[in-house]
Amino acid sequence: MIGGVLTLTAVSLGSQAQAASYGTPSLSLSAAYLSGAVGATADPAVNVTVAQSGADAGALTVTVTKSSKTAVATTADVSVTGTGATRKVVVAARAQGYTDLTVKVTGVDGQTATKTLHYAASAAVQYASDSRYFTGSSDASAAVDAGGGYTIVADDESNVLRLYDRSVSGAPVRTWDFSSNIGASKEIDIEGATRVGDTIYWTGSLGNNKDGEYKADRNTVFTTTVTGSGASTALAYGRSYKKLRDNLVAWDKANGNRYGFAAGTADGQIPKEINGFNVEGLEFAPGSTTTAYVGFRAPLSPAVTGGKALIVPVTNFDKVLSSGTAATFGTPIELDLGGLAIRDIRKNASNQYLIVAGSWAADDNSDPYALYSWDGDPAHAPVKRLDLPTSDPGGWEAVVDVPDLTVSGARAQLITDDGSADLYGDGTEAKDLTHDEWKKSRATWFTVTN
């Protein structure tokens, strides 16, 4: 018996010695909050970094062991891939809503550690396989191509510019905020942008805020200079101009108040009304690097149901930004967009334009949206390419670039502003969500030629 006891004691001591040679395993998440969508393709992932002293990280096991709301996603809906110290977690959502997922690492000796991943799933949308979600902000309002499959996206609730990979859903690769350079303490309400060479021109809405109050920062146009392309894109601040609204009002007054700009900018005037004042499109005229087309969401012309969309050419736009010269204007252009207004306008090197058309109103996003093509000639009418879907969250706000519209099957990527959308079914507007990782705008590819 004594020998038996001694033998058992020796085994016990040996086991303790072996256990003591390994530390407690650890894991960290690249983000504690993650957003996905039902039926989505290329949804965002979270990287899990694991370690255990005395052990090869590749020998550790990572699993998801619990979901707090299995109607949204079960543990079987979570995939963990990768080897070594970094693993990737992807969730395939079952339904709209929130769930907390328990991520566990198991060490080679059976010791464990856990972290909680807070997951939010938005509902399925049309064109799901052609949709991607740009996270970090829900209020996308303008976009320009950065080359190499990337785009720079502006936000009308902040002054942050974000660089995204257009092919996948996820967080921005890089961000910039030039508020201090511009001298802006509030949002500029960026609504339009266009690129000429290495210069990107950005414009605020130029209108009052939603309460009809004048906010000086919204009366801002500025430039950034681009270096690099794709994931290596970098931006530097250029110059700003803060009197374009004033120039437009003075020009309209001098021409008989044809468009009612003075009344549209008056104290108390709501900008997103049929007779309001709100800029949302910016692009250069065909073959020009000096004359810019400023596209209006409001007013329509005339300011009645069925009125035409308004473009005012700024004939010295380059000089306005480069030297602060007061803006001069050409003959205004009125386009028949079926009673809709301009929400974005973009052209390619062949002077083929796409116009995102939508309501002047600040209604919900069930109002009609359409995509038109145009050749930039004021004498020529735009042609409707397609009606855009309106049953999903978000309003169509931007088109990244324009493909060759003479080629069959050409596709364009459009982006929604989801700031007012209830993405997760709990009554919270996306702009008010407590975590930036849950905020997102949707980018969808549409075929625009037959």
Regions found by a protein language model. Give the residues of each.
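Sequence/structural signature of beta-propeller domains
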Residues: 83, 120-450
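Conserved structural position at the C-terminal beta-strand
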Residues: 105-107
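C-terminal region of N-terminal signal peptides and the immediate post-cleavage residues
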Residues: 7-24, 193
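Low-complexity "stalk/linker" and mucin-like segments enriched in Ser/Thr/Pro/Ala/Gly
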Residues: 63-87
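Extracellular/luminal low-complexity segments enriched in Ser/Thr/Pro
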Residues: 86-98
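C-terminal edge beta-strand
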Residues: 111-123
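Extracellular ectodomain surface segments
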Residues: 23-61
